């Protein structure tokens, strides 16, 4: 697993998926799963999860623990599970977060492993959906904000 140009390869993959989806709006993408376990996608997913920090899930494994184990080894094992259909998401760790009014709200914290897979899936499917979204849509989209939506209105 080479990490040096994963970002560029992922950008090219996403651009290709976006352009294909934009060109053929009736096209259905039946085979995106193989994109999730690509080396470059898993490496980029790892980098994004690591940059986002966050605490460990129910397994207690932290980002630092994975770095000590060896990122390449960890991602190879995860890739193998995904390819063989043996990947099973872990339960979510439930933490109660205090609200300003004194009550609490539940927060679910997935394991780092599950966050990597979720991010890899996001990397694969996001450009397909982006191609269908309208220009006037701003909610929860990359490189768009509430401020930009207000400027348009």
Predicted regions and their residues:
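Conserved pre-catalytic core of RNA-dependent polymerases
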Residues: 2-153
């Amino acid at each position: 697993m080479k990490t040096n140009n994963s970002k560029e390869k992922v950008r090219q993959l996403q651009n290709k998926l976006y352009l294909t989806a934009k060109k053929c709006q009736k096209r259905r993408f039946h085979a995106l799963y193989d994109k999730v376990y690509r080396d470059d996608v898993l490496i980029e997913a790892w980098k994004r999860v690591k940059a986002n920090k966050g605490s460990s899930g129910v397994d207690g494994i932290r980002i630092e623990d994975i770095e000590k184990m060896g990122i390449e080894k960890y991602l190879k094992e995860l890739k193998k599970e995904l390819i063989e259909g043996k990947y099973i998401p872990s339960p979510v760790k439930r933490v109660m977060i205090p609200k300003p009014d004194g009550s609490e709200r539940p927060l679910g914290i997935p394991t780092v492993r599950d966050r990597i897979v979720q991010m890899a899936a996001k990397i694969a499917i996001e450009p397909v959906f982006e191609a269908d979204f309208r220009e006037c849509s701003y909610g929860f989209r990359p490189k768009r904000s509430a401020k930009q939506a207000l400027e348009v209105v």
